[in-house]
Amino acid sequence: MLFLLASEVVLAKKPWIIDPHTHFKGEEQIAYEATTKEWHPDNSLGKVVKPEDYRAVADRLELRSTLVVEACDQDKPEYNDWVLRQVKESDLLCGYIARADLKGTEFLIHHRRYQRTGFLNGYRFRFDELNDYLNDPLARQHLAILERQGLVIDLLIEASHADDVVSLSRDFPRLKIVINHCFRAKIIDGDISDELKRAIKKCAAQKNVFCKMSSINNFSEVAPFTDPAPTDLNYYLPVLDSVYDAFGANRLIFATNWGVSAHFGSVDNVKDVVMAYLKPKGQKVVDSVMFRNAMTFYNIKRKYLR
């Protein structure tokens, strides 16, 4: 009994939040992108970012582990391989959402290689890529494979893509789908657009669609690398209330989007705002949104948590 109690005390002190949205890049990728892109000097996407750079943030915010999300071009599978190596080597990382071209004939070659690592949790599509895949026979074959394998599709999209989300959900009803950053919501003059409100309700009606309550700073009207985003919970209620009322506590997933969210203010604010919103709803809701939903939805293995 004493041993069990001691174990529980140790466990209680561990970081407890799962952060299923961060970005990391290695030297080779940054050197390549320096020849193809022009980043703001303070943009984290233009810098080498490794797991140890995240450790202080994770410890401070009680983030137990992070699921990394792609930040690379479709035709650079070697950058997926780099991230997967980081996941294997770092106790902070518990999985990866990769980048790929589902219309490509070599998709399955790379997919099988990623799977063999044991750290692949799914793929992310960006904007109009989703519509392209829905209209491509080979991509649809690959989507059916991902559905059978229980993998997740992350979507970096906006409200204008809502119909495509519905089509994906209905055509592949067992596919696990998650909308990133509340459709990249923007609060203008204290509210969100009617188009966004409709998109949230339309997509939430599909039961295999989840939503990340993530990157809260980016919802503000401030420009990146200028003044910090507001810290008052009330400012963010137009977004938070809309997604909570539509998706409910069991289909929302917290995430920081570090370090992009830091372009608009402190990453601490992302957690603080979401926690301030969830706490009055009870500990069960807090636990669901802050870690349980991510663990279940992404099939994160506990043995990979620090």
Question: PLM ranges: what are they?
Answer:
Residues 1-8:
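Bacterial N-terminal signal peptides
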Residues 9-20, 29-31, 35-61, 65, ...:
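Mid-to-C-terminal alpha-helical segments outside catalytic/metal-binding sites
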Residues 14-16, 62-67, 90-95, 117-121, ...:
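Short, well-ordered coil/turn segments that N-cap beta-strands
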Residues 21, 83, 96, 146, ...:
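Conserved, mostly hydrophobic/aromatic
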Residues 37-74, 93-100, 121-128, 151-153:
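Divalent metal-dependent hydrolysis catalytic cores, especially in the metallo-beta-lactamase
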Residues 46-55, 78-82, 106-110, 162-165, ...:
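Alpha-helical scaffolding within the catalytic cores
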Residues 74-160, 167-169, 183-184:
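Active-site gating/metal-coordination segments in enzymes
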Residues 133-253:
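Catalytic pocket-lining loop regions of alpha/beta-barrel enzymes
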